[in-house]
């Protein structure tokens, strides 16, 4: 058990950042198309 366990750090990081970026891009896409 080493302290530098990159996979155990990167997996939740990617699992959180990737959906967050997808949600942000989707939100911006909807905001740009709304034109109300």
Swiss-Prot record:
Q: Name one GO biological process term.
A: photosynthesis
Where is this protein found?
A: Plastid, Chloroplast thylakoid membrane
**GO cellular component terms, semicolon-separated:** chloroplast thylakoid membrane; photosystem I
Q: How does it sit in the membrane?
A: Single-pass membrane protein
Q: Keywords in UniProt for this one?
A: Chloroplast, Membrane, Photosynthesis, Photosystem I, Plastid, Thylakoid, Transmembrane, Transmembrane helix
Q: Where are the transmembrane segments?
A: 8-28
What is the similarity comment for this entry? Answer: Belongs to the PsaI family.
Q: What does this protein do?
A: May help in the organization of the PsaL subunit.
Question: What HAMAP family does UniProt report for this protein, alphabetically?
Answer: PSI_PsaI (MF_00431)
Q: What is the protein name for this chain?
A: Photosystem I reaction center subunit VIII
The gene name reads: psaI
